[in-house]
Amino acid sequence: WNFDNAGFVFSTKLGNVTTLRYVNFGFNYHKAKSFNKTTTMEGQLGLSQTELMAAQANGMFYDGIDLAYYTEKGINPYDDKGNAGWLGALGWDAELFYTDDHPTLPFYPYVTNPYANYRSEERGGVDQYDFNIAFNFNDRVYFGITIGAYDVNYRKTYYYGEDISNDGEYYDLWSDNRIHGAGWDAKFGLILRPLEESPLRLGLAIHTPTFYKLTYTTEAEIGADLWYVDNETGEEFMDYHSYSTYYKLGDKKMNREFELRTPWTYNLSLGYTVGHNLALGAEYEYQNYSSMKFYYPEGDKMEYESSQVKNNTKGVSTFRIGAEYKVIPEFAFRLGYNYSSAAFEKNAVKALSTNSLNVDTDYANTKSLSNYTLGIGYRGSSFYADLAYKYTSQKADFYPFALPTETGTYDTPAVTKVTNSRSQVVFTLGMRF
């Protein structure tokens, strides 16, 4: 059970003959997004995450950051001065890739086809608080403005491990990631009744981008159990060793502040009432996700992150249709359908920069989303209640990582097809005073 919505509207009637008939003031809270999800997978991959560790280390090397030199000089790769990618640095510390005897690459892995285990837990959500004012002109023109405030709280715990040989060698990678902060936006809406004698309604709405100020907090740890050879005796032995960014940073987590600007939203709607019993409605909405931008706190654009969004996402069209039929004036049945196209390009990948703090390499390219709703409502003189069933379905292509190649493309393990479905029962109560 969740209490995800609450609000009120205060209506002021100014007169029956004045141009401005009503002014309404409202407030509404609702859970705009829930991140709660747990995912587990395992299997033979054909590729190893250690290849991605080595690839990031090579990228750092060509950018002037040599992990072998850092080790020799005692330079901490995990702090701000080190400016190294954590995935490559942890893999290097855990000795999961080599640095010599290769003809072309500074670093290269020795694992190619491990058995992998993956688990992630995501928790939190986005709470939205809307403050609005609306105007009714001659019962034919309706205009409203809404200022929205957002509170973001997201947490992801990530675990990934590989059995890298038949002799018991393995490694485990873990990270804890949090994003918290706040944002705001503005919404402008207009509804017109173009013909006084007709129940036809036309609507237009524009939503500004949401301007977020966020803080990313992370820590990571790797542990590996590997076979070694004693140089003096020649005997083989297995040794477990682990490395933690929390320890390397002096018992601290790493914090990064950034800003996010979401796309503009454009909405068109159409409504019509047939007689006194049947109401029909339809909407079309568009958001271009490739226009999202990331910024540093100082205001400069984060070029790499913004370019990745531009290359991997696209515009999303959303269609909504609904109908309400009043059996008697107090009771009504409702049906609704909502379709949103996919936000990701077909071959979208998660590509980490050479200095990325992220070690959670997994990603899922979600497909189109469908919502189906069925409900019943009661309207009394001072009390109303609504009961609705909502079913949501969305497919996704899941990958544990994407490995860059020398040609500029990406290799991935075989795709895992995922279907996310959710059923909800929503009950709403309201009072009129």
Sequence positions of predicted segments:
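Outer-membrane beta-barrel porins/channels
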Residues: 4, 9-433
